[in-house]
Amino acid sequence: MAFPELLDRVGGLGRFQLFQTVALVTPILWVTTQNMLENFSAAVPHHRCWVPLLDNSTSQASIPGDLGPDVLLAVSIPPGPDQQPHQCLRFRQPQWQLTESNATATNWSDAATEPCEDGWVYDHSTFRSTIVTTWDLVCNSQALRPMAQSIFLAGILVGAAVCGHASDRFGRRRVLTWSYLLVSVSGTAAAFMPTFPLYCLFRFLLASAVAGVMMNTASLLMEWTSAQGSPLVMTLNALGFSFGQVLTGSVAYGVRSWRMLQLAVSAPFFLFFVYSWWLPESARWLITVGKLDQGLQELQRVAAVNRRKAEGDTLTMEVLRSAMEEEPSRDKAGASLGTLLHTPGLRHRTIISMLCWFAFGFTFYGLALDLQALGSNIFLLQALIGIVDFPVKTGSLLLISRLGRRFCQVSFLVLPGLCILSNILVPHGMGVLRSALAVLGLGCLGGAFTCITIFSSELFPTVIRMTAVGLCQVAARGGAMLGPLVRLLGVYGSWMPLLVYGVVPVLSGLAALLLPETKNLPLPDTIQDIQKQSVKKVTHDTPDGSILMSTRL
């Protein structure tokens, strides 16, 4: 009796799976708030140099005449490229000649200017404080803001490697529990950090734990659910990220101080840490590592929750030993990472799949973590992204089963690229159109993620499938790390980041045309199967004569 049969006996889709899904997907909503938090906690408000005539009461007392703040601003700060007060320069001396009615640009163009030596004055009408206002991450220090976002995303990359190994060694539930604790502690500590480097350090630790939460949530959902119920619970898990986008915008709208906002999205993980102790460990993992007595206890516990206590009582250690012997071998028959790059039939699949994953992570996080550049109301924009993500993810599942994997993959990468490139031509004054294009583009990227997740699983043979998918996810996280840094090109022109964000998905989408279609094709089991496949049509019989087809979704 193999493990799937054991799971069917105790219930593979029942009350327990319902409770478990609610308990595990709820933290995913709050994980999304951590991922998207710096849209708000690192927002850049309007700012100008601190100047004595406006910001020093002693200097104001000595001003001759009755001059209003607009006049004092004009004589203290030169206009910037958009004819608004410059954000990074001020006059060394007040330019009183600018108060004359016939004053022109020539009246101040030769005047000496200097950087904001005494700091900045920020507009607090939208946010009481952000990390930008706390540590003056503007002007010459503006590169530190996207650097903080890249450090967070680097933490997810490192955490995925560490937590993946740890969960295989110590168990899914145990690593998940301590990941909850690390998120709560690191997030709380980050809210109180007095310096920017310490803030980045604790955000890095938080991100590494976030990776542990995401990975082990998916593992527990999959390993405690029957094959028939897995698509449902994994879809709910994916939709948790969509609703998390809406939650992020809602919480940020109500909490305008970055320290309190960081606390607000970290505190719930203390609760998740406490109740996670009552979640069962993966019985499949326990049996695989030889902990049969614990595996038996967990199976009987699940059977009781699913009202199948009688079936659970019939399970014995002998039955579990039989299940352990019948579990498929994990031996990959010599397949390794080098196999992906040195086998002709796999090389181009690996490279193009990695390019598609890279394009998704690069473009999505590059845009989604800089909503200020896409629209004026970032709270509404964040919520709209989540609302649009819901039908796109569910709709993409239907489209790929009808139109094919390759066509949908190409479309869901090229379309957002075109939306982003179109935004270059839209004037900044047309905020609604810019926001609509941004939401549509990010929504399509959500569809691209759904497609590439399924497509890449079907492109590679069973013996090396997880290695290939893991390599592709590394490419996605590497792209996510680089995405925010592209915004630094904005110093050469506001259109430069959008050009890069638009070109990358378009090129990767076109490259996906070189991949073979996998709709209704047999899933390859060995590398030899890949080498025998033609691009258009293959047939592959399993040893018992049946045909193992690719997944319908």
UniProtKB/Swiss-Prot annotation:
Subcellular location: Apical cell membrane
Tissue specificity remark: Detected in kidney (at protein level). Detected in kidney cortex, in proximal tubules.
UniProt catalytic activity: urate(out) + (S)-lactate(in) = urate(in) + (S)-lactate(out); nicotinate(in) + urate(out) = nicotinate(out) + urate(in); urate(out) + n chloride(in) = urate(in) + n chloride(out); orotate(out) + nicotinate(in) = orotate(in) + nicotinate(out)
Complex formation: Interacts with PDZK1.
Residues modified to Phosphothreonine: T542
GO molecular function terms attached to this record: PDZ domain binding; urate transmembrane transporter activity
Transmembrane residue ranges: 10-30, 146-166, 182-202, 204-224, 232-252, 260-280, 351-371, 378-398, 412-432, 435-455, 466-486, 495-515
Residues modified by glycosylation: N56
Family recorded in the similarity comment: Belongs to the major facilitator (TC 2.A.1) superfamily. Organic cation transporter (TC 2.A.1.19) family.
Functional summary from the UniProt entry: Electroneutral antiporter that translocates urate across the apical membrane of proximal tubular cells in exchange for monovalent organic or inorganic anions. Involved in renal reabsorption of urate and helps maintaining blood levels of uric acid. Mediates urate uptake by an exchange with organic anions such as (S)-lactate and nicotinate, and inorganic anion Cl(-). Other inorganic anions such as Br(-), I(-) and NO3(-) may also act as counteranions that exchange for urate.
Post-translational modification: N-glycosylated.
Main location (coarse class): membrane
Organism field: Mus musculus (Mouse)
Membrane topology label: Multi-pass membrane protein
Modified residues (Phosphoserine): S534
GO CC terms: apical plasma membrane; brush border membrane; membrane; plasma membrane
InterPro entries (UniProt xref): MFS_dom, MFS_sugar_transport-like, MFS_trans_sf
Lineage: Eukaryota, Metazoa, Chordata, Craniata, Vertebrata
GO biological process: monoatomic ion transport; response to xenobiotic stimulus; urate transport
Keywords (A to Z) from UniProt: Cell membrane, Glycoprotein, Ion transport, Membrane, Phosphoprotein, Transmembrane, Transmembrane helix, Transport
This protein's name: Solute carrier family 22 member 12
